[in-house]
Amino acid sequence: MEKVGENVIKIFIDGVGNVYFNLQKYSTTISEEHKFIYYFDAEGRFMGGFFDGISYRRGLDNRLMKKFFDKDGFKVKVFVNDDEKKRIIEDVIERVSRIKNELIGHGFGSEVLNRINEILKWNYKKLEEEGIKFFSVYKPISILPPDQYFSLVLQAAEGCSWNKCTFCSFYQDRKFRIKNPDEFLNHIKKVKEFFGKAIGLRKSIFFR
């Protein structure tokens, strides 16, 4: 084991090569030879990765988006279907499990193993359940300003107070309603429970 950065550890693992662990306060990134990279939040939930020239990002609703350049050089963003999502997530978990077995076999006992154990709690089934739980905490978040993607969204109201723009259909499926104080406090409690330790990744608060 070699420390190669302030929070980065390098470990050589047979059959894999050099594996880098970036241990941040609220996230963990694992990189296999800088070719297969995947990262997780402080609770151990898979957040996304980069492999085979494709970037993946998992949303709080457990949808998985992939981004890549097509043969003409155009950037493509698309949500994968359930079969592909399951294959990717299970492959990541299998890789992490294999790394854990190698570390245990060589007598490693460290923060790296503690984080890996947290990651391995979140298999595909549990992440799917988390996606369902998301919709018990939030009404659909139709759109966010680009500078608020990493904010903690709190829904003090539902719908749009105007909702008459002919070019916008984001909130036509629901009436505008402001939550009363007790409702909003309960919403905040559910949000905090949902994010857990990973709430530290959120840079600001955005009220909807």
Predicted features along the sequence, with ranges:
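Core AdoMet radical
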Residues: 171-187, 191-208
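Canonical Radical SAM [4Fe-4S] cluster-binding loop centered on the CxxxCxxC motif
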Residues: 145-186
